[in-house]
Amino acid sequence: VTHTYIQGTGEFKAGFFPFRLFSGRALIVVFSLILATALIWFLSMARVADLGSGSNLASSGLIELWKHGDVVVMIRHAERCDRSPNRCLGSADGITVNGSQAASDVGAGLQRLGLERAHLIASPLTRTQQTATYIAGQTVISQDWVGNCDTHFKNEVVGHKTKGENLILITHSGCIDHFERTMGVPAGERSSEYAEAFFVKMDGKSIPRVLGSLNAVQWKSLANDQLK
């Protein structure tokens, strides 16, 4: 409320400040700030690119980073026997025959990418051990932390990454999910298929960066020159 003095009367006349105009402008400013904040938050979220689609593999920089040993790849175990009607490879706590073929396909793809500067570690569970064997073509060492899917998983990954050597982990969807959460990957993108590979840049100089993922089938569709 404002008060205006009226000459000749000795009286004050009450009036109202134009709150409607002020409020309208204030709302626009507040709305703009909210929109800008939401946009910044959206753009800051890590995205998991489909490296088997279009030019995503080339634009990710994965190949060059792999040559320098600056990549961590987390691979979910192949199809579980106890959750599938397909024929089991062996015991019920392992993978299926179809899963072993998928793991072999992933292994062939990694061979084309190059395993000279790579270190493989698997979770000790049967399904991850079998998957790792078919990926590598031989027995792979196991360590408990690779199967401990909790909030400390990312720190364990960072701590076990050696400079100049790619790290390949045969693990579980829960572990990959925990890692993605700490990287800011939105819930709708935090999923991994059987034998899907999730790639992260980890060079020891900058913060880890999500590069993208490849499922088991996509490895076959990649030409040799795309992996060199």
Where are these regions (language model features)?
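Active-site-proximal alpha-helix that buttresses catalytic centers in soluble enzyme cores
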Residues: 2-144, 149-152, 160, 176-178, ...
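Generic beta-sheet signal
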Residues: 71-72, 163-171
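Flexible acidic/His/Gly-enriched loops in nucleotide-sugar-dependent glycosyltransferase catalytic domains
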Residues: 155
